C-alpha cells in the first residue's frame, strides 16, 4: 500500500495528465467554431453564444454538454454569476468550492490542461485563387509569416448554412488551419456550396479577404464548449508479458493501464513501467466551440 501511494499513484497521475493535455491540444485544433473576443474574460452572453453554435450544428440538446475552462477565467465567471439565480444546490457548490455548477445547460469543469493556442502570422490576407467546390486548400497573397495549425479564419461574405435546410445563417462560416505556408492554407471543413454536405452559401472569389481570429503571435487559453460525442477517446488492453517479476492490468473510468515490474540484474534494482495504449479524435468538430479567453 505504501509503495502504491508513494510511487504508483503519483506516476499514474502524471501519465494521465499528460494524456489529457495532449488530447486537448490535438482535438481543440480540429474545432473551427469560435465565439467571443480573444484576450478578454468570456461574458455570459458569449458562453450562451457558444452553446447556440452547438444548437446551430444540431448537437443533441441533452445533459452531455460541457465547458472546460482554466482556473483564472473560471474565477471571473464565478464572480460574474454570483448575483444570478441558481438553485440552492448550485449556490452551495459555488460558495463552497469556488466553481460554477451546472448552469446554462452546461456542466462547468475547471481544468488547467486545456489547450493554449498561439496565433500564427498575418491575421488578414487575400485569396489569390479561384476556389472550387470541395476545395480544402487556398492559395493566398504572400503573407509575412505562415498561419499556425489551429488558427481559425473566416472569408468575407461567405456565410454558414443550416446543416439540414441549407438556409444561410447571419454569421460567416469559420474554418480551421490544418497546414500552412506563407502562400497556401490547408483547412477544414472543405468548401461545399451545394449538395448534401453544403456548409456555405456560395464559393469565395479571388481577392476575397481572409481574417484570422485573434492577434498575430499572441497566445490565448482555448476554453471548450462541446457535446461529449464531438470527440472520441479510446484505450485498449495491452498484452500481459510472461516471465517477469510482476504484471498487472487495471481498468478504471475508461482507461486501461498496465504495470510491469522486472528485476534488472546489471543494476540490482527492480524498475517498473506503466503503459496506456490510447487514441483520440474529433469525430464531430461542429459539435464543439472554442472560446479564447484571457487567462489573466
Feature annotation, model-predicted:
Residues 1-40, 46, 55-73, 96-110, ...:
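Long, contiguous amphipathic alpha-helices that act as assembly "spine/axial" helices in icosahedral shell
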Residues 44-52, 134:
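Active-site glycine-rich loop that binds ribose-phosphate moieties when present
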Residues 66-68, 152-154, 174, 271-275, ...:
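Ordered hydrophobic segments in well-structured contexts
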Residues 83-120, 202-204, 208-296:
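Protruding loop/beta-arch "assembly-hinge" segments enriched in small, turn-prone residues
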Amino acid at each position: 500500500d505504501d509503495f502504491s501511494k508513494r510511487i504508483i499513484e503519483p506516476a499514474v497521475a502524471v501519465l494521465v495528465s499528460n494524456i489529457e493535455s495532449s488530447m486537448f491540444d490535438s482535438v481543440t485544433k480540429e474545432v473551427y467554431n469560435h465565439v467571443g473576443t480573444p484576450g478578454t474574460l468570456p461574458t455570459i452572453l458569449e458562453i450562451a453564444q457558444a452553446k447556440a453554435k452547438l444548437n446551430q450544428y444540431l448537437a443533441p440538446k441533452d445533459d452531455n454538454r460541457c465547458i472546460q475552462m482554466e482556473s483564472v477565467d473560471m474565477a471571473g465567471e464565478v464572480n460574474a454569476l454570483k448575483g444570478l439565480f441558481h438553485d440552492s444546490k448550485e449556490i452551495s457548490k459555488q460558495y463552497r468550492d469556488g466553481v460554477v455548477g451546472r448552469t446554462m445547460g452546461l456542466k462547468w469543469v475547471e481544468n488547467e490542461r486545456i489547450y493554449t493556442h498561439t496565433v500564427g502570422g498575418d491575421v488578414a490576407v487575400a485569396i489569390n485563387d479561384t476556389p472550387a467546390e470541395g476545395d480544402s486548400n487556398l492559395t493566398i497573397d504572400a503573407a509575412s509569416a505562415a498561419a499556425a495549425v489551429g488558427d481559425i479564419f473566416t472569408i468575407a461574405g461567405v456565410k454558414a448554412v443550416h446543416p439540414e435546410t441549407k438556409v444561410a445563417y447571419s454569421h460567416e462560416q469559420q474554418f480551421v488551419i490544418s497546414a500552412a505556408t506563407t502562400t497556401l492554407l490547408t483547412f477544414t471543413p472543405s468548401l461545399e456550396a451545394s449538395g448534401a454536405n453544403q456548409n456555405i452559401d456560395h464559393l469565395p472569389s479571388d481577392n476575397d479577404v481572409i481574417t484570422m481570429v485573434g492577434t498575430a503571435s499572441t497566445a490565448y487559453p482555448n476554453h471548450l464548449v462541446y457535446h461529449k460525442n464531438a470527440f472520441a477517446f479510446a484505450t485498449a488492453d495491452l498484452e500481459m508479458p510472461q516471465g517477469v517479476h510482476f504484471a498487472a492490468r487495471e481498468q478504471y473510468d475508461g482507461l486501461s493501464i498496465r504495470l510491469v515490474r522486472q528485476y534488472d540484474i546489471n543494476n540490482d534494482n527492480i524498475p517498473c513501467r506503466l503503459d496506456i495504449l490510447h487514441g483520440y479524435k474529433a469525430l464531430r468538430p461542429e459539435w464543439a466551440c472554442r472560446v479564447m479567453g484571457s487567462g489573466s
